Amino acid sequence: MSITIKLLVGLANPGPEYAQTRHNAGQWYVSQLASQENIQLKAEPKFYGLTGRIQFAGNDLRLLVPTTFMNLSGKAVAAMANFYRIKPEEILIAHDELDLLPGIAKFKLGGGHGGHNGLKDIIQKLGNDKNFYRLRIGIGHPGDKNRVSGYVLGKAPSSEQNLIDQSIDEAARCTHILGQDGLEKAMNRLHSFKAEK
């Protein structure tokens, strides 16, 4: 059973100082999809972000990278969803995930925010509706919750970055499977992916 995704969002903090930080993994994924489709993301002030449009499983798919700060991501997501009348279950949010190792990415439908400030704001701005898809991109955990903030706002060493990049490439390929064949097939492929060190 195919799934209609109409809005794909990559969470990030704006500005060059954050571009290569782990917290911006969601943006790396959306940029990868845009580059595969040969489109440039453009600033769109009314949606508080960088936007683009591709054809996806026969439907228009809007791409969005909020240029608000992470904890205000919901403002951009809600603005675009409201304008195009996109329901929460037609949205896929890509974000960095502390609870997965670098090189691992997983699709998921629904759930809480797990302490992720971007997800927290999106859930709130969508009227507490959590029923959207997520792509969780593993960045690993620093081992101490007091070090999380510095960790997500830091750059991964090149060995870890290579693993993250591989998982993002595979996730981009699996996104097409998600649209054409449904969540189960996309999950089966993505969740069995092994990044090469």
From Swiss-Prot:
<dbReference type="InterPro" id="IPR018171">
    <property type="entry name" value="Pept_tRNA_hydro_CS"/>
</dbReference>
<dbReference type="InterPro" id="IPR001328">
    <property type="entry name" value="Pept_tRNA_hydro"/>
</dbReference>
<keyword id="KW-0820">tRNA-binding</keyword>
<keyword id="KW-0378">Hydrolase</keyword>
<keyword id="KW-0694">RNA-binding</keyword>
<comment type="function">
    <text>Catalyzes the release of premature peptidyl moieties from peptidyl-tRNA molecules trapped in stalled 50S ribosomal subunits, and thus maintains levels of free tRNAs and 50S ribosomes.</text>
</comment>
<dbReference type="GO" id="GO:0004045">
    <property type="term" value="F:peptidyl-tRNA hydrolase activity"/>
</dbReference>
<feature type="binding site">
    <location>
        <position position="117"/>
    </location>
    <ligand>
        <name>tRNA</name>
    </ligand>
</feature>
<dbReference type="InterPro" id="IPR036416">
    <property type="entry name" value="Pept_tRNA_hydro_sf"/>
</dbReference>
<comment type="similarity">
    <text>Belongs to the PTH family.</text>
</comment>
<keyword id="KW-0963">Cytoplasm</keyword>
<dbReference type="Pfam" id="PF01195">
    <property type="entry name" value="Pept_tRNA_hydro"/>
</dbReference>
<feature type="binding site">
    <location>
        <position position="69"/>
    </location>
    <ligand>
        <name>tRNA</name>
    </ligand>
</feature>
<dbReference type="GO" id="GO:0005737">
    <property type="term" value="C:cytoplasm"/>
</dbReference>
<dbReference type="GO" id="GO:0000049">
    <property type="term" value="F:tRNA binding"/>
</dbReference>
<comment type="subunit">
    <text>Monomer.</text>
</comment>
<comment type="function">
    <text>Hydrolyzes ribosome-free peptidyl-tRNAs (with 1 or more amino acids incorporated), which drop off the ribosome during protein synthesis, or as a result of ribosome stalling.</text>
</comment>
<dbReference type="GO" id="GO:0072344">
    <property type="term" value="P:rescue of stalled ribosome"/>
</dbReference>
<protein>
    <recommendedName>
        <fullName>Peptidyl-tRNA hydrolase</fullName>
        <ecNumber>3.1.1.29</ecNumber>
    </recommendedName>
</protein>
<feature type="binding site">
    <location>
        <position position="71"/>
    </location>
    <ligand>
        <name>tRNA</name>
    </ligand>
</feature>
<feature type="active site" description="Proton acceptor">
    <location>
        <position position="23"/>
    </location>
</feature>
<feature type="binding site">
    <location>
        <position position="18"/>
    </location>
    <ligand>
        <name>tRNA</name>
    </ligand>
</feature>
<feature type="site" description="Stabilizes the basic form of H active site to accept a proton">
    <location>
        <position position="96"/>
    </location>
</feature>
<feature type="site" description="Discriminates between blocked and unblocked aminoacyl-tRNA">
    <location>
        <position position="13"/>
    </location>
</feature>
<dbReference type="GO" id="GO:0006515">
    <property type="term" value="P:protein quality control for misfolded or incompletely synthesized proteins"/>
</dbReference>
